[in-house]
Amino acid sequence: MATRPKVRRPDRALYVPPKVDRIKRVIFACGHRKRCEIGYRPLGDSGNCGPCGARRDVFAPDLYGSGPLPPCPVCGRAVVGPTVREACGHVTCNACETEACAVDRLCIGGGRRLVAICDPYPPYPGPRWRGPRPTRPEAHEAVQRSRGSSEDACTCAP
C-alpha cells in the first residue's frame, strides 16, 4: 500500500493531505448534519455528533442511499428525500406527509428543535427560550387539543 506524500507547511510541523474518495453527508439521530470524507478519518473523530453527542449509527443515511429506510406505514411508499424523523424512532413519510406522533417535527434540512410526545424527556427549546421547560404530559395534552381526539390517539410505545 502506497503512502501519501508528506508536505511541509509553515504553520504546521507536518501536514499529511487527506485521501478523499468522495464526500458524503451523515445525518445523526438528532438531526444535525456532518460532512464526512470517506477514506480519511481525522484525529479525534469518535463518530458522534459534535454539538450534542448523538451517535451516528442510530440513523445515518447519506446522499448515495446507504441506510435504507422502512416504508411508510400509511401509504406503503418508500421514504426518500429530505427525511422527517421523530425522536421516538418513527420516520414520517414525505409523500403523504403523515405526522405519526410528533408535536413539532424536525426536517433534516431545517433547524427547528424536535419535541415528540413519545419522548419521555423532550429536548430543551434552546438558550433563548424564556418559558418553562415543556414536559411530556403538557406536550401530549397540547397535541390532543390541537387534533381534537381522545387520549389514546398516540400509538407510540412509551
From Swiss-Prot:
Residues 126-158 are annotated as: Disordered. Residues 135-150 have a biased composition (Basic and acidic residues). It comes from Ictalurid herpesvirus 1 (strain Auburn). Keywords: Metal-binding, Zinc, Zinc-finger. A zinc finger (RING-type) spans 72-111. This is Putative zinc-binding protein ORF9. The gene is ORF9. One of its GO terms (molecular function) is zinc ion binding. The keyword Zinc-finger applies. It comes from the Viruses.
